[in-house]
Every structure is written in structure tokens, then in C-alpha cells.
């Protein structure tokens, strides 16, 4: 099952990065500096932005849906990393393409945007692609 594969991959990848990642869901959010992710995105309190562009987002076990971005998994090291070193990764799909997004945002802004960018980490991108297409 793909979620078990991703969990195993994130445990191994986290070790190589010296970080400890935990899985979160639409029912159980991570606390990122007081923001509950992905809850604040899914309930509309905060608008998700990818590369500065606001997008709609939804939780999707299958990776398909109507929104701009389908969130299939959330991983974070926020419980174990110190202040300003916390990461939240969203694993999902944009226009049916697998995409791993990351945020380290630690403060609010007037637009209530939660800013994500596609991860620059090729090992992480390739790992997710292999699980999706494997």
C-alpha cells in the first residue's frame, strides 16, 4: 500500500537528513507555530499558495478531485525540530502530476496565505514519484 511505502521512505529519508518525520492527516493536524496544518487550509481559514500563487486544495485519498491541488499525505518534523527549523511537507497532485510541497512559514501575513514551494530535494521528489508510479 502506497501510504505504508511513503511512511517507510520518510523514516529513512528523515534519518539521512537528521530529522524525524511524523505523518498527519485531514483528521490530525500538525502544529506549525500555532497553525494546524492541513486543517487551516481545508477549512478555508488560510489560503494555500504555491510559489506565491493562491490555489484551492482538498484532501484526497486517491489523488484525484476538483481542487487545484489534492493533498494525499502530510509529513512534518515540527514536534522534534527547534524553532525556525520546522518543515511541513505536503504530498499530492497538481493537474494529475505528483508534487511534493514544503513550507517553513513561521508568521502570518495580511492575506492569510500559507506559502508552499515545490521541494528542491530531488531524493524526496524521486522517492514520491517512484511510490506513485511504482
State where each predicted segment sits.
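Mature, Sec-exported extracytoplasmic domains of Gram-positive
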Residues: 1-134
Amino acid at each position: 500500500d502506497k501510504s505504508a511505502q511513503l511512511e517507510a521512505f520518510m523514516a529513512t529519508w528523515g534519518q539521512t537528513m537528521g530529522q524525524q518525520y511524523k505523518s498527519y492527516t485531514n483528521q490530525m493536524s500538525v502544529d506549525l507555530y500555532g497553525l494546524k496544518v492541513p486543517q487551516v487550509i481545508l477549512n478555508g481559514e488560510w489560503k494555500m499558495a504555491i510559489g506565491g500563487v493562491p490555489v484551492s486544495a482538498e484532501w484526497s485519498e486517491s489523488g484525484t478531485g476538483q481542487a487545484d491541488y489534492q493533498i494525499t499525505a502530510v509529513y512534518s518534523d515540527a514536534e522534534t525540530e527547534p524553532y525556525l527549523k520546522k518543515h511541513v511537507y505536503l504530498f499530492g497532485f497538481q493537474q494529475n502530476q505528483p508534487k511534493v510541497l514544503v513550507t517553513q512559514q513561521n508568521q502570518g501575513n495580511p492575506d492569510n496565505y500559507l506559502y508552499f514551494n515545490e521541494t528542491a530535494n530531488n531524493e524526496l521528489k524521486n522517492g514520491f514519484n517512484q511510490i506513485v508510479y511504482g
